[in-house]
């Protein structure tokens, strides 16, 4: 596993809990001390899996290759940054390792993400006889598997799909992001995008919003965003007439975001800053990226768990033609308690909902249930064994048939 942030911490805990499946495990990251701390916390919690750690720069293909050649993993779980997907995939191909990630590739110098860069690896993974599993977090990931499950068991044709993501938690901070601030702010300041009648429709950032009611939470203002799983789902389920992704934001969060943008702190280009030298002898010109500097001063998402209250609610609202030939609606979702996630893994619910599915995807691969040569999005595999594990591993799902979808 590459990465040692909140999601990686959760995934590591869950791997240690399933030592009957995962017998050999290594965590590697830019800072080995972070990997060692995860292992220490896992062993303190009473899990006995032998976990190796290593230092690696995931931007460097040669370093990755040296690590993979030494350890010889069957599967590499990429929980590093989206900028690093392609270097890790290259190293996997060079060393005969299969691959799994939770977020699609995004170039560092452009706030833009899509699957085409990774789909371009299909033939190379196929020829090498290796599996690449893309987008195996919650959204993307579980939301795509929910859709596959609905298509397999409840619908002849899915016509309308709305993925809804609510974080109704309170971390008692004026402003903080629930995962890497740089990635988070880049994502939500982009233009919105949804699929309707065979084409992509673009909106201004956060332009479209409406109140949606979430189970056990109530109504929350939900905003239409561009989210990557829509891109693969409309290809794999061509009967879909419209597919959208919605996420909740509080007014305080949006006000901070507006100020960050207005003062130029969301910029991803380099600016030159004259930094005074420590000995007072003058200044040095240094290049900094404002958004990366902002990340350094914002709360670390890994430190939010302790005082986090409330829960997340993420699911799919689907309308289409059921197996009986009549129109039906279907809502499948999970609610996850921040407090319960923290008590189990030391991390908050947003990290938990991404880290658990990453482990389950790895389990599906290791058991031979999700193993075929090529590059695949998760909805292209059998959803049933994954759905079964969600209930066992801490993310139970619930269904509402023929309810009001509000959309």
Residue ranges with predicted function:
Residues 1-6:
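Conserved N-terminal Rossmann-fold NAD(P)-binding element of oxidoreductases
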Residues 8-12:
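N-terminal Rossmann-fold NAD(P) dinucleotide-binding loop
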Residues 24-26:
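Short beta-strand element of Class I
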Residues 30-34:
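Helix N-cap at the beta1-alpha1 junction of Rossmann-like dinucleotide-binding domains, i.e.
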Residues 45-60:
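Rossmann-fold cofactor-recognition segment
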Residues 56-73, 80, 84:
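Conserved Rossmann-fold cofactor-binding substructure of NAD(P)-dependent oxidoreductases
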Residues 102-131:
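Rossmann-fold NAD(P)-binding glycine/threonine-rich loop
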Residues 152-407:
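C-terminal catalytic/substrate-binding lobe primarily of soluble NAD(P)-dependent oxidoreductases
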């Amino acid at each position: 596993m590459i990465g040692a942030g909140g999601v990686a911490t959760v995934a590591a805990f869950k791997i240690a809990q399933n030592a009957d499946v995962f017998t050999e495990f290594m965590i590697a990251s830019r800072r080995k001390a972070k990997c060692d701390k995860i292992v220490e916390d896992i062993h303190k919690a009473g899990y006995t899996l032998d976990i190796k750690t290593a230092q690696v720069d995931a931007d460097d293909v040669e370093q990755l290759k040296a690590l993979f050649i030494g350890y010889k993993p069957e599967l590499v779980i990429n929980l590093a940054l989206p900028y690093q997907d392609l270097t890790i995939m290259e190293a996997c191909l060079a060393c005969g390792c299969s691959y799994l990630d939770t977020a699609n590739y995004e170039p560092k110098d452009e706030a833009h993400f899509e699957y085409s860069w990774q789909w371009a690896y299909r033939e190379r993974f196929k020829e090498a006889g290796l599996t690449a599993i893309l987008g195996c977090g919650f959204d993307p990931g579980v939301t795509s598997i929910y859709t596959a499950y609905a298509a397999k068991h409840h619908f002849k044709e899915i016509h309308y799909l709305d993925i809804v993501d609510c974080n109704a938690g309170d971390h008692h901070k004026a402003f903080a992001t629930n995962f890497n601030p740089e990635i988070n702010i880049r994502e939500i300041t982009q233009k919105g995008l949804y699929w309707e009648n065979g084409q992509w429709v673009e909106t201004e950032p956060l332009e479209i919003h409406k109140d949606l009611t979430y189970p056990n939470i109530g109504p929350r203002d939900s905003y239409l965003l561009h989210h990557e799983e829509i891109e693969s789902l409309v290809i794999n389920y061509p009967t879909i007439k419209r597919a959208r992704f919605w996420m909740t934001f509080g007014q305080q969060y949006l006000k901070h975001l507006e100020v960050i943008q207005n003062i130029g702190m969301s910029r991803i280009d380099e600016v030159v800053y004259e930094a005074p030298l420590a000995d007072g002898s003058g200044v040095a010109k240094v290049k900094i990226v404002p958004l990366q500097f902002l990340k350094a001063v914002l709360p670390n998402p890994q430190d939010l768990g302790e005082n986090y209250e409330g829960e997340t609610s993420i699911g799919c609202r689907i309308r289409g033609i059921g197996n009986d030939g009549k129109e039906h609606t279907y809502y499948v979702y999970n609610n996850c308690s921040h407090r319960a996630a923290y008590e189990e893994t030391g991390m908050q619910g947003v990290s938990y909902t991404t880290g658990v599915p990453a482990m389950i995807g790895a389990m599906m691969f290791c058991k031979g249930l999700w193993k075929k040569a090529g590059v695949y999005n998760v909805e292209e595999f059998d959803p049933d064994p994954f759905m079964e594990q969600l209930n066992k591993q801490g993310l139970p799902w619930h269904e509402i048939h023929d309810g009001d979808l509000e959309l």
